[in-house]
Design a protein with these regions (language model features):
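Peripheral, non-catalytic segments that deliver or gate enzyme domains
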Residues: 1-217
């Protein structure tokens, strides 16, 4: 659904093998636009100006998503712009929208590492790296509000910790703890909301949910 609720991007598997076609419907008239984007994967994201879609392109043989493209509504798919291309065949790309809807993240991962890049969601262009890839380092990133990203990471934390960092200086040397690393508690996931977070944690095989403020209290 576009941010102004005037258009819907409908994703259909018409060929099998998880190759999807994206079509656009005008919700005020009920008519389908001429836009048709074939052979996509992993859904799509509306830009906040409601003028474009961002989507992933898979390799037709390996099914690995290797490109993130931008489609301008009303234009032909052949004119879509490549925002990011991953040539390392061990990495699979996935684009997702921040909780604030202000940023689009591109996550490239393999079995032993991952890397995240970001761009503005109003007019996505060049993606900027948050922290370069390193073996055995996994991290996820989100944006809730303001000038900071939140980062869940296993850097110096085998059971993961939750950090924050200024968007202007997102590298790991600038990460400061919201939830510090703990030897006996595994930080499984964190769901982010405007005024609080919900942390799912595991201790001695038991899973608990904990509501915390953005400063970790």
């Amino acid at each position: 659904m576009s941010h102004d609720h005037k258009m819907a991007a409908v994703i259909m598997d018409v060929a099998g093998r998880n190759f999807y076609t994206i079509k656009i419907k005008d919700l005020s008239t009920g008519e389908w636009l001429k836009d048709e984007i074939k052979d996509t994967r992993n859904g799509c994201i509306w830009t906040t100006d409601n003028k474009s879609l961002v989507y992933g392109v898979p390799d037709k043989e390996t099914l690995r998503v290797y490109q993130i493209k931008k489609h301008v509504i009303g234009d032909k798919a052949k004119n879509d712009v490549v925002l990011l291309q991953e040539d390392d065949q061990t990495l699979d790309l996935y684009a997702y929208e921040s909780r604030s809807k202000e940023y689009i993240f591109a996550f490239a991962s393999r079995t032993d590492a991952g890397i995240i890049k970001y761009t503005k969601a109003n007019q996505p262009d060049v993606f900027t790296t948050i922290e370069p890839m390193s073996t055995d380092h996994y991290y996820t990133v989100d944006h809730i509000k303001g000038d900071e990203f939140v980062v869940r990471t296993n850097y110096q934390a085998k059971n993961y910790r939750l950090c924050k960092t200024k968007i202007a200086a997102p590298a790991k040397e600038n990460w400061t703890d919201i939830i510090s690393a703990r030897d006996n508690v595994f930080l499984e996931t964190v769901e982010f909301f405007k005024d609080y977070f919900i942390a799912q944690e595991s201790t001695n095989g038991l899973t608990t949910l904990r509501v915390i403020s953005p400063n970790g209290q």
